Amino acid sequence: MAASWRLGCDPRLLRCLLGFGSRRSPELVKGAARWSVGRGASWRWFHSTQWLRADPIKILMPSLSPTMEEGNIVKWLKKEGEAVSAGDALCEIETDKAVVTLDASDDGILAKIVVAEGSKNIRLGSLIGLLVEEGEDWKHVEIPKDTGPPPPAAKPSVPPPSAEPQIATPVKKEHPPGKVQFRLSPAARNILEKHALDANQGTATGPRGIFTKEDALKLVQLKQTGKITEPRPTAALPTTPAAPLPPQAAATASYPRPMIPPVSTPGQPNVEGTFTEIPASNIRRVIAKRLTESKSTIPHAYATTDCDLGAVLTARQNLVRDDIKVSVNDFIIKAAAVTLKQMPNVNASWDGEGAKQLPSIDISVAVATDRGLITPVIKDAAAKGLQEIADSVKALSKKARDGKLLPEEYQGGSFSISNLGMFGIDEFTAVINPPQACILAVGRFRPVLKLTQDEEGNAQLQQRQLITVTMSSDSRVVDDELATRFLESFKANLENPLRLA
């Protein structure tokens, strides 16, 4: 950046500051830099252009969601040399949730695009571009050598052990000549050990030479009929004295295993039994990681009930006559929000030490997109009316499918709802979306004949429209008794739409 100073002082003082002697010329030209000292004026000035250039502003890969670790550059919206104002869209970044626009935080000129569009798996904190101030020579901006993310904090060094541990060499089991080493199934191994039989006395009939349970049972029958004798005990093999092994050899040393032909051969898609690897997007990888963590770390419990939608369908028809379009799913969201307001203990999460009740009722609604499942959030759903919920769901679902959700539109949430009724699914169980404690799985509504009584007590068959809902809950936060009471209240609220007003 060109920098200039105006100094209102005597030229002799400037000469001293610049290191000039009294006999030096008041003007000095060296390379592309120029100093000059004016004479006969009320002010003096000093100007430098090359030696005081500011460093460019770094544009780093930002963290656009709590679970984001990497990002993809989908498209650059500005070109090199183009002026940028604070708030202008610089580029589109695909996160683990959606495609988000990165806005500029400073005014200037986009000098360098360090990471081209289409680049994938860019770590957080990596340099993706450089910005300079207006008037700078943006064409000659140098790219820093270190463009990667900052290194993690150094861990305290652990002193090496005083002596190398001695690892005994594993003794290889020698097989007598003429014997074949079979691969035993667990059941077959148990039977052979129980009856003191040797697999070499029989024949392996399993796939790829596996000695199966049936093969072991045949040996037992032959032994019982006297057609085979028990194997003679062999002399114990001499053992080798313990000797130290290098770490790599110690890690790979094991008993020999029979050679098994591979099930598939990568790289040959036309060969039977092979596969084609499908590249996973950031969203797919994060979904897989979070689902695995959820099922392996959260104790899931399930509770199921049926709800009669007769009153909801009637109320929906009445609203349509007034040109108010709401779906059955909007009624379900509203019923869940009202129930959470009545039972705030369910509107909670587990923070590692205990349950934490959440202040706002924010409903996450699962939306299927080409990039995977994403859950936009209906903020403060208990305070919204049916029409507001319907409008929010439509707008957020469209943005989710277009990949235009903002981070604040899918982050957070205190309770999730996943509805597969439109796909003809009667009922299912869903995986909890951490750190939330519950998710409600909703199936399709279906006609069912039920035996009821009229006002006079006479039995009669009536057709009812039922849906099955299953709540998955974190047992650390919502126990079975609390989950049961929640579903009872949810059912009562949904079957009586007037309670939702």
UniProtKB/Swiss-Prot annotation:
Q: Which residues form the Lipoyl-binding domain?
A: 56-132
Please give the residue ranges the record annotates as the region Disordered. 141-179, 227-252
Q: Where is the Peripheral subunit-binding (PSBD) domain?
A: 183-220
Q: In this chain, where does the modification N6-succinyllysine occur?
A: 394
Modified residues annotated as N6-lipoyllysine in this record: 97
User: What InterPro entries does this protein's entry cite?
Assistant: 2-oxoA_DH_lipoyl-BS, 2-oxoacid_DH_actylTfrase, Biotin_lipoyl, CAT-like_dom_sf, E2/Pdx1, E3-bd_dom_sf, PSBD, Single_hybrid_motif
GO annotation, cellular component aspect: mitochondrial matrix; mitochondrion; pyruvate dehydrogenase complex
Q: Which post-translational modifications are recorded for this protein?
A: Delipoylated at Lys-97 by SIRT4, delipoylation decreases the PHD complex activity.
Query: Which cysteines are cross-linked by disulfides?
Result: none
N6-acetyllysine modification sites are 194
Interval spanned by the transit peptide: 1-53
What are the record keywords, sorted?
Acetylation, Lipoyl, Mitochondrion, Transit peptide
* Keyword Transmembrane part of the UniProt annotation: no
Tell me the superkingdom of the source.
Eukaryota
* GO molecular-function terms, A-Z: acyltransferase activity
Instruction: Tell me where it mainly resides.
Output: mitochondrion
Locations listed in the record = Mitochondrion matrix
Give the record's subunit note: Part of the inner core of the multimeric pyruvate dehydrogenase complex that is composed of about 48 DLAT and 12 PDHX molecules. This core binds multiple copies of pyruvate dehydrogenase (subunits PDH1A and PDHB, E1), dihydrolipoamide acetyltransferase (DLAT, E2) and lipoamide dehydrogenase (DLD, E3). Interacts with SIRT4. Interacts with DLD.
- Give the UniProt family note: Belongs to the 2-oxoacid dehydrogenase family.
The record's function comment reads: Required for anchoring dihydrolipoamide dehydrogenase (E3) to the dihydrolipoamide transacetylase (E2) core of the pyruvate dehydrogenase complexes of eukaryotes. This specific binding is essential for a functional PDH complex.
What PANTHER family would the database entry show?
A: DIHYDROLIPOAMIDE ACETYL/SUCCINYL-TRANSFERASE-RELATED, DIHYDROLIPOYLLYSINE-RESIDUE ACETYLTRANSFERASE COMPONENT OF PYRUVATE DEHYDROGENASE COMPLEX, MITOCHONDRIAL-RELATED
Could you tell me what this protein is called? Pyruvate dehydrogenase protein X component
